A protein has these predicted regions:
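One-carbon transfer enzymes
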Residues: 2-279
Length: 279
């Protein structure tokens, strides 16, 4: 589905509504696509369920296996690549956080979803029959990708009735790409933020639906990442509210000049040399 048709379709399906819509108006059906990110995702969902407006119905969550950007393969391949890229000490710290979160039920995504009564279904990929069947069963108005380190296949967007949007932890069009929090700290920037945009063929290139800024007051990536994840819930609600009211998205311009890719070893060395830390 192209960007121009996205907002038109949502309005045709639900119509613009005020902040507190009448109780008899059909709720907006939202499906979430994510990866089982072991750091801050459970907290993010916990906040989303706590603050969701009455007109929002979260009908299901599709969960794919977590894999850091640019690394695919066996667990051994993953560990070797992460150790080489980020250093063994940072890898061990990350492992300690992951194990600690796995041992605490409240920090597990599955626990949060079960307590909220929202069904979660695991998938290996989005362009398969299983995911297509789940989309048909849930029949969402909107699908949002959160903490999703993959590209949504174009065929999925083309064949979907739903509007697709993405949550990006950066101020688009600045720092497009898979590691916006890293690059904001790497470059010594003093503010970052969250952008929710329509999903397009161009990665992080869809029209902007909502955006909020936040001062960077901590040079540890994990702390900043958590703060932005929690802020992303508010920005997502802003975006969905705007679509329901018929607010036109803004153009995501200057795409070619704003792309930042996966950090290389030299970038990580510079990141640390400037006083930043991962944990």
């Amino acid at each position: 589905m192209n960007e121009r048709l996205a907002a038109e379709q949502l309005l045709a399906a639900t119509g613009p509504v005020p902040d507190e819509p009448p109780r008899d108006k059909s709720p907006l059906r939202l499906m979430i696509v994510t990866e089982d990110e072991p750091f801050h995702l459970a907290e993010t969902f916990e906040k989303l369920f706590a603050v969701s407006p009455r007109w929002l119905d979260i009908v299901g969550v599709a969960v794919l296996a977590f894999a850091p950007v640019g690394i695919r393969g066996s667990r051994l391949t993953l560990l070797r690549a992460l150790g080489t890229r980020y250093g063994m000490s940072n890898l061990l710290r990350a492992a300690a956080v992951v194990v600690g979160n796995r041992l605490r039920p409240r920090r597990r995504l599955g626990t949060v979803l079960r307590q909220s009564g929202v069904a979660a279904t695991g998938f290996h990929k989005l362009d398969g029959e299983a995911f297509a069947a789940e989309m048909a069963r849930l029949d969402p108005d909107v699908v949002v990708t959160i903490a999703f380190n993959r590209i949504v296949p174009p065929i999925v967007l083309e064949e979907s009735r739903a509007i697709w949007m993405n949550v990006h932890l950066g101020l688009l069009p600045h720092n497009r790409g898979p590691a916006p929090v890293f690059w904001a700290l790497h470059d010594g920037e003093h503010e970052s933020g969250v952008t929710v945009h329509l999903t397009a063929d161009e990665v992080d290139g869809g029209a902007i639906l909502a955006q909020r800024r936040r001062a960077i007051d901590e040079r540890r990536l994990a702390v900043e990442h958590r703060a932005l994840r929690l802020l992303s819930v508010d920005v997502l609600i802003d975006a969905l509210t705007g679509l329901r009211k018929g607010v036109a998205p803004s153009r995501n311009s200057d795409l070619a000049a704003r792309w930042r890719g996966v950090p290389e070893t030299s970038h990580i060395a510079a990141f640390l040399a400037r006083g930043n830390r991962f944990f």
